[in-house]
């Protein structure tokens, strides 16, 4: 794009320094109304000058901010390269807000090159939280927990309970199956914070928290906690309820809550999803549909379950392998699948 010089107007006339502090503060405290209001206002003001140097860069930034916080659409990967290049061109507080969007886009896209991000000592609370995620992805869990403790103290003092819950949500990833007491303590902290400050926490942040903690509880086999969080998440009418559907089915079965499982697989909303999701879900539907019909169940075991196992991974693969072993014994079809079971066991996660 060929940009022009403007000798009639100064960018500072349009953008007082205070506006960038307000913008960063709104980002840190997740004030959607203010983020949308500020960005929309400056998109309109800068639009007539968007073909001029400096005006163009600010116009594009405000447009990306407005687009993300009004419709949750992130910049393209190509745009993130451009945003990174603006470090010494645009206001530093605006750059912090933009780099949060860059971080979100690149991690969601599976790009884990963190050399562009210097968040550890950032003046932005949201980006210091992003530094926690970087430490997690680098498997620096001890350093992550130490850093987390500092953030917890700071965010509590500043009454930023939205970002405090973000920190708790990330902290859960650091705990393994052998640290269930620590995870239970974290869940207690989360419940206390949500109960005390629920009116100040946007629905979307509560929804994200319920999903993330539920998935973390499921990961370390704390199925009762997982069920509690998943059920609350689904009750909020989340458009992404199918994300936790299979995990909830497995959690119900692991805790022998079969009536709840049957009720869940009959609900309409669980059928939203891609082919892989529905394939996994059909296992539970068919298992309980055919539980009194040995011939049909045997056919399903022999012809369908191996396909499910071959097309899943990690915890799902382990679960369906165990299910197949159990169902084969129940229906006396072990001989038909002995070779398959033996070969598959080598591919299971340790």
Residue spans for each PLM region:
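Canonical BTB/POZ domain core
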Residues: 1-41
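Residues that mark the junctions of alpha-helical repeat units in TPR/alpha-solenoid scaffolds
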Residues: 16, 54, 58, 91, ...
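Structural motif corresponding to the intra-repeat A-B loop/turn of tetratricopeptide repeats
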Residues: 30, 105, 138, 177-178, ...
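Alpha-helical repeat scaffolds
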Residues: 35-42, 73-87, 109-120, 142-153, ...
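Residue at a conserved register position within TPR or TPR-like alpha-solenoid repeats
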Residues: 102, 135, 155, 168, ...
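TPR/Sel1-like alpha-solenoid repeat signature
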Residues: 171, 210-217, 229, 248-252
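C-terminal non-catalytic interaction modules
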Residues: 282, 287-289, 296-350
